Design a protein with these regions (language model features):
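Negatively charged
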Residues: 1-222
């Protein structure tokens, strides 16, 4: 629709778009590099199954209104906000992610994002989380206590480059596959132990001998 409208700074009249039958919104605003804000509160997304790369490389975007998004049928959110480097906040509290299988690269290089509330995220069906938060250089903490990772097969580089990240709160059932460079560049991260640049793989994804923080947990690496 608006793919690679690189000089586009604003969009008017989106409330008149009938999106009730749309199933695929992948790449819809991808590479709208000059767009600074977008209000999608009137979008009907009840039938959408794919939102991958929807806002990919919207590098100047500072705000997105997604409060009325119905995501109950969405299965693919991979790269959804990839390289939204100017976003400082993102309200996803209404997101229903129960059917999502791909969250890889979802917030990759959201370099100005200082916090994100994912407490309502249902991740029981997610299989891909590789690079999910990679490059989120301004994030200081992540609360992932509600994350169910039993079906995840790839967490490679999941938190890599999160240079300001000090705390990752995990739950008691976090399971982690063997994943390369999961914590690379997370130099301020501290859980049970402080960060060690030579220990950045999935073996450190636990709160007992690794970088996660939790009251009492048993975390398994498979």
């Amino acid at each position: 629709w608006f793919y690679r409208c690189e000089a586009l700074k604003q969009i008017e009249g989106l409330e008149y778009l009938n999106t009730s039958e749309v199933k695929d919104m992948s790449g819809m605003f991808s590479d709208c590099a000059a767009l600074t804000s977008i209000d999608l509160k009137n979008f009907n997304t009840q039938n959408v199954t794919a939102m991958s790369s929807m806002f990919h490389h919207c590098a100047a975007l500072t705000s997105i209104n997604l409060k009325n998004f119905n995501t109950k049928n969405v299965t693919d959110m991979g790269g959804m906000f990839l390289n939204c480097a100017a976003l400082t906040s993102l309200d996803l509290k209404n997101f229903n992610t129960k059917n999502v299988t791909d969250m890889s690269w979802m917030f990759y290089n959201c370099a100005a994002l200082t916090s994100i509330d994912l407490k309502n995220f249902d991740t029981k069906n997610v299989t891909y989380m590789g690079r999910m938060f990679s490059g989120c250089a301004a994030l200081t903490s992540l609360d992932l206590k509600n994350f169910n990772t039993k079906n995840v097969t790839d967490m490679s580089w999941m938190f890599s480059g999160c240079a300001a990240l000090t705390t990752i709160n995990s739950n008691t059932t976090w399971q982690c596959p063997e994943s390369k460079d999961m914590f690379a560049g997370c130099t301020k991260l501290k859980g049970a132990v402080s960060y060690d640049k030579d220990k950045v793989d999935a073996t450190m994804a636990n709160p007992e001998t690794g970088y996660f923080t939790a009251e009492s947990t048993t975390v398994r690496s498979r």
